Amino acid sequence: MALPNKFFLWFCCFAWLCFPISLDSLPSRGEAQIVARTALESEAETWSLLNHLGGRHRPGLLSPLLKVLYDGHGEPPRLQPDDRALRYMKRLYKAYATKEGTPKSNRRHLYNTVRLFTPCAQHKQAPGDLAAGTFPSVDLLFNLDRVTVVEHLFKSVLLYTFNNSISFPFPVKCICNLVIKEPEFSSKTLPRAPYSFTYNSQFEFRKKYKWMEIDVTAPLEPLVASHKRNIHMSVNFTCAKDQLQHPSARDSLFNMTLLVAPSLLLYLNDTSAQAFHRWHSLHPKRKPSQGPDQRRELSAYPVGEEAAEGVRSSRHRRDQESVSSELKKPLVPASANLSEYFKQFLFPQNECELHDFRLSFSQLKWDNWIVAPHKYNPRYCKGDCPRAVGHRYGSPVHTMVQNIIHEKLDSSVPRPSCVPAKYSPLSVLAIEPDGSIAYKEYEDMIATKCTCR
């Protein structure tokens, strides 16, 4: 008997390995969550499990974020950004996102990506003439390989960040002279006249600064739109010389232009499907060329929150009442307690609802390049769907019809499943392989509402 027992045990293990757990079946989902909590102790085991949870059965649970982030896993050590630039981006993240990592609803910007680049090369040029109010110019080269073709520029600034605040005793008016130069070409390319574009921006220094931004959108917009990988620019400041007589004002500007290399900050709109598009959240109900008849027709089929509010036409309300009455007919013994019946079938104990799935990027050993958020809770839906689903779940009439088919006609037709009905986006601040810093907003990353379908 020992040999058949061993063979049976081997066969069960082999079958378990060959047929992955389906997240669409309720018992296996519960088992998968138990395994997930114990597997977080090991990075390899954790990724294997999370990859399974974010696979073809449940693409919305952990993908696309973990899949996108894992693409860089195992690369050589990443370049670390400048501390001042990192502090600035952390401050930007706090202004744009909550502690849970969701974009703040009171923000009205239409971009979903902010990239900060530090110069990959820096050279001093003309020494300048402080007596005439002209400060030394600096030659800068920025590499924009991380900007993708689906990212469109909204705004670009030169960012000066300081360890200590610089102060000015009185306002100082200056002009930033920016010269965009064409990169040098190899001898194999056809010779052409050198290209340069000069851009002047006027601004005024006031009081204390921990950072300073100079808008350079106009000269950079055509270069980013044409997907230029390298941007070569020369920057210098010219200030009114009569306002530089005060030593503190002159020293502050001198330290800023010589001791601090500016970063390039790009505000972009990622148009890919996995990015969060804030315009749709600001105008969720706007549809092109929609007449009154179309609006009435659409309102008859509400989903998500609209269905939860009970926005239905009278015709569908009558359909639901007739189906509900049909559901109440079958097989209720005369001696049965109606309250127990409704408790068992209409409101099951393991009711469909949201559950937490908390993970930490430090457990995945990704916290050295995922700066924020520190923790991620995608949440998931689990539980039994009641036989007569009402407005609370926002389920369509088809869900009730499916229940009737399962119970009366064909048991092979599955019962409605407990699935997410609504999601919220997630904001992520990460260090890229080249040492640049990226703030990105990902769509549909946190389940916020469950339904039965």
UniProtKB/Swiss-Prot annotation:
Residues 1-27 form the signal peptide. SMART domains: TGFB. Residues 318-328 have a biased composition (Basic and acidic residues). Its main location: secreted. It is found in: Secreted. Required for ovarian folliculogenesis. Homodimer or heterodimer (Potential). But, in contrast to other members of this family, cannot be disulfide-linked. PANTHER family: GROWTH_DIFFERENTIATION FACTOR 9, TGF-BETA FAMILY. Belongs to the TGF-beta family. This is Growth/differentiation factor 9.
